[in-house]
Amino acid sequence: MIYLHNIKLTAMSKILVLGAGIAGHTASAYLRKWLPGEHEVIVVSPNSYYQWIPSNIWVGVGRMTIDQVRFKLAPLYKKWGIVYKQARAVSVHPEGDSEIQSGYVTIEYTSDEQKGQIEKVPFDFLVNAIGPKLNFEATEGLGPGKNTVSVCTYSHAAEAWEKLQQCFSKMQKGEKQKFLIGTGHPTATCQGAAFEYILNVDYEIRKRKLENLAEITWISNEYELGDFGMGGAFIKKGGYVTSTKVFTESFFVQRGIRWIKQAGVIKVEPGV
């Protein structure tokens, strides 16, 4: 038997990883690398692709394509000796039942070949790495297909790029455009991605020499700029220490970006 961070693995253990994003993919890769071959590593994910989420920002401004930020999971996991099931987890049963003595997860396949099929996947150890749920429904009018765009997934980011190009076309014809970028709910905590995106949008506008036709505004539930969901931080460079509040404000002032802070979005209306 071996121990993995104080967890005892007996012969032929089944380690089930839920999720194949940054956390799940990393966990399964290291588990397969570290564990002897008799132990089985299983990954369950509803998606057929792995995507590098931070690069969605560049998809959203046309600097990368969808296929540059994703790859198929099945071929890689087959090469690595990882059992891959394209399915969504429906329920977790840590105590098992009358049929399965160990814990198991009920899954529903999402692949074209097995779509809708239900299976019970036993496990000896479970890694929960499913990530966050995109809760656009929490704010009326928020989300793709409604009154905003998003860069939360590669498909969302591709749509954002399409909409951004439409704005560029209007600006090139002399029509002013307003851009409102930030967090979409009073309790949102991922301001960093929106901050990256607003600066990239500003860069693309300036690259096209259209900045005089653009009004860019940052909206966030942060108490102060630069909180980034963690109460701010400090940056040391060139012998100076600067707070992220000053850092962020300086970036925005330099680029003429307006800001609205301590604001929780509760509704997004069309054409506003």
What function would you assign to each model-found segment?
Residues 13-86, 185-242:
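Beta1-alpha1 glycine-rich phosphate/pyrophosphate-binding loop at the start
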Residues 81-91, 253-269:
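A conserved beta-strand/loop element that lines the FAD pocket in flavoprotein oxidoreductases
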Residues 2, 28-30, 70, 112-115, ...:
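A generic local structural motif
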Residues 2, 7, 85-196, 200-209:
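FAD-binding core/adjacent interface of flavoenzyme oxidoreductases
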Residues 25, 108-113, 268-271:
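Short gly/ser/thr-rich secondary-structure transition/capping motifs
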Residues 71-75, 244-253, 266-268:
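Charged, low-complexity cytosolic intrinsically disordered regulatory segments
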Residues 236-260:
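A glycine-rich helix N-cap at a beta->alpha junction
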